[in-house]
Curated annotation (Swiss-Prot):
This is Persulfide dioxygenase ETHE1, mitochondrial. One of its GO terms (cellular component) is nucleoplasm. One of its GO terms (molecular function) is identical protein binding. It comes from the Eukaryota. It comes from Mus musculus (Mouse). Binds 1 Fe(2+) ion per subunit. The modification N6-acetyllysine is found at residues 32, 66, 172.
Amino acid sequence: MASAVVRVAGRRLSQQSASGAPVLLRQMFEPKSCTYTYLLGDRESREAVLIDPVLETAHRDAQLIKELGLKLLYAVNTHCHADHITGTGVLRSLLPGCQSVISRLSGAQADLHIGEGDSIRFGRFALETRASPGHTPGCVTFVLNDQSMAFTGDALLIRGCGRTDFQQGCAKTLYHSVHEKIFTLPGNCLIYPAHDYHGLTVSTVEEERTLNPRLTLSCEEFIKVMDNLNLPKPQQIDIAVPANMRCGVQTPPS
């Protein structure tokens, strides 16, 4: 693992982000899979991280990064997605020096593999990795070092959560992940999910702790709900999962 991805105590991280300009944040949307991609950058060092890029919008993301004068260090996936092909492969070719990152528990290839407690540094900032399995075994949530925002992937959505009926998902595991790894964050911590299907963009920990119709249930009730969703499988799953297992180390097929 490269030295830029290291285990760092939360207190030290908070001190790093307490001075200077706030983190640069851009939320971008891909309409076919209703996926949010997040660009975070340090306004001083110009180092940046991109979370959950999508193949169809990778050139858009690269153009924005260039326009803002940023250097993309990492293209990060919160998990091995089933509804779209990751844009990490294209971004690595468009932006030399960018490395792909994913949880080691995903089983996917990447330049760097991370796990619980690892931190991804960019300038004065860092993202803490919190394992949040359940939607898939390799799901992670990324928490900015001052705990002002969390990027929850498919583990926690706005008034919802990721499904648990494929990719070795487990409703009980997801319930405990959200309650133990996300709902323990400060109430005003902003929640940025990987998807939204209703035009919503951001929530907070307190909102989801009190208003999320699934995750305010008991664990037993939650499992019953998740086991009876009867959703169709994602349209791209047979193409997306094999491509995403390469996680951008090899350019995905177009």
